[in-house]
Amino acid sequence: MNKAYYGRKWLLQVACNDGSVLEIGEDGISEETPLKVTFDVNYPGYQGWYFSEFNIWNLTSDWQQKIIGEGSEIWFYAGYKEGNYGLLFSGKVFQPFLTREGVVNYKLTLMCMDGDRLFKDNFISTNMPAGYTESQLVNAIAAQAFTPIPVNKITERLAPSQLVRKSTIFASPDVPIREVVRNNIDSYLYMREGKLNIVDVNESDSSQEPLGINSKTGLVGTPQQTDFGINFRVLLNPVIGITNPPMEVKVDLSKVNIAMQRAVLGRPVSVVDQTGWFKVGGVRHFGDSRGNEWYTDVTGYALSGKTPANLTVPLYLQRASSN
């Protein structure tokens, strides 16, 4: 019997601004029952910062007051005792609040953000000499921002041409970086674990085999066809995520039925890529440490044909709140 999906394992770490660190978790071995925790880690698409929500029940009042204080950071790991286990979220707590449920239960909700250094309370004031490239511009902005922004990877497919005029930048860091992305077709800006990425969605990592998706690897229910590819759910898998270049998965269509789109008059229906190969364009991890939920929802798009457009801020917020 495959034990890769048995024995839940998770760890929630919260670093408070006074230097203390709260750790709550379950290692899948001991019989001790930790506090109830629910999580919703949502990366609905490229282009933007990301919000996640964590709920903790019945913390001591001392820890509640420490975490409610400004400046807490959070890390969340989840997976299985004998299977995949890894970091799902790393970011800042931007809104904590306490609610009472019933007579004796208190729930601490932590609204968290990944990407605050790019979009929140940051600024860049610098001059770029003539002859710089767009890649050099992005790296300079990240390094010279009031709060420096770590850079993970910038696609090599950005326009290599040198700009003939010098320029002065006096703005929030995301403004000139978004302009670079708009000037490069199929390029996306996103933050992951606090690090800046610019990815070209047509790139692929030839050194990595696509992740197989079938009933033996945790597929739950029936994948749903979309305009761009398919959406599907698997048992919680920290391996699946927003990556640079985009992660590829292979759905075994010989053994998996797909719920087809319903035909609408005047609207063409897409054809599912029969190779079963898709790129991961959005991921949502969610679960309940004492409940049944322990899943990963994936948005996949075909390797050929249409690709999703960059998410605007209003559209991103709409996608994030709808899950």
Regions found by a protein language model. Give the residues of each.
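Residues that flank catalytic or metal-binding motifs in active/ligand-binding sites
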Residues: 89, 194, 276
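Compositionally biased, intrinsically disordered low-complexity segments enriched in polar/Pro/Gly
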Residues: 1-6, 60, 80-82, 138, ...
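Acidic Ser/Thr/Pro-rich low-complexity disordered segments
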Residues: 20-29, 151-154, 159-160, 210, ...
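Solvent-exposed, acidic/flexible segments
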Residues: 67-69, 82, 86, 127-135, ...
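An acidic/polar, Gly/Ser/Thr-rich interaction patch typically located in mid-to-C-terminal regions
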Residues: 37-67, 202-323
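Acidic/polar residues at beta-strand termini and the immediately following turn/coil
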Residues: 80-82, 190, 212-215
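Charged- and aromatic-enriched interaction segments used to assemble
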Residues: 103-211
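Assembly/oligomerization scaffold segments
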Residues: 1-111, 280-283
